[in-house]
Amino acid sequence: MFRLAYNTNGLSHHRILDALTLLSDLGYEGVAIAPDVACLDPFHPREGEVESVRKLAADLDLELAVETGARFLLDPRRKHRPTLLEESAADRARRADFLRRSIDLASDLGAGVVSMWSGASPNGVKADAADSEEDDDPRERERIWDRLCAEMPPLLHHARERGVRLAFEPEPGMFVERPAGFDELARRLGDQGDALGLCLDVGHLLVTGDVPVGDVIHRSASRLVHVHLDDIAGGVHEHRMFGEGDLDLSEVLEALVEIDYKGLAAVELSRDAHRGAQAAEEAMSHLRRALRA
């Protein structure tokens, strides 16, 4: 059975140890930790912080994962930049360095999974968007693919050495935004891609039109190692509380049970951080009702 978890980007106004205790008290069995400027910043580690988090998580029997979606950690002016797809090799190296540090952090915390995404390409080219085939320059798309495929093997090697699984998340608006793009990345990486897991955000599937969500979960079963839970309304990429959008939460959880998924299913509600404790409690209530349905 999978474990219900919560992403700390939805508790960004809480101290990390307080967040772990709160989530455990609410019944969560895991925490997806998003390193950021005020939470386990891998560029400015605080003495004893990692060990304190690891010990408390163990005491509370919380399974941990590490998420790498911090908005402005690498650049205070540009959200989610630089990426692995930048024109500048130095910029690509900055993202790769952050990902390596996040892998190290996960290993030190005892977390088994690190999630990542491709980032947006500099000129907006998409690998897998249904409406991009006629508009994008195929040669430019191949150049972006070449960059991504060149950056992935060293990261996969580092993760393997540290005993951590990399989970790649298709993200709307980024170069790889659909499960089909993940499949293509794994194909292009060949044998090196065998270790790459899939991080599936069920809300994103409503944005990109990859539905029914339950069917996508079943098709992805063999590569699925991490799951994000959130609702989406009208196909707009804004994470919402369950019940505020179009997601059939019972369908999602039933599909995860049917495929015998064993990883974390982590609620991701970063836009609700201003009411983080209340949102985490509400989300758990929705999850419990859906599991009983």
Region spans (language model):
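Short, conserved active-site loops that position catalytic residues or coordinate cofactors/metal ions
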Residues: 26-37, 66-79
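Residue-level preference for long, well-ordered alpha-helices that form the structural scaffold
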Residues: 42, 46-49, 88-95, 137-144, ...
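Short acidic, glycine/proline-enriched helix-loop-strand junctions
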Residues: 41-63, 132-134, 138, 164
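Histidine-acidic metal/acid-base catalytic patches
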Residues: 1-5, 10-27, 54, 58, ...
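Glycine-rich, proline-tolerant flexible connector loops at the mouths of alpha/beta enzymes
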Residues: 34-53, 118, 124, 237
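Non-cysteine beta-strand/loop elements that form the S-adenosyl-L-methionine
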Residues: 33-34, 65-69, 116-117, 221-232
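Active-site acidic/histidine proton-transfer and metal-coordination neighborhood
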Residues: 17-18, 59, 73-197
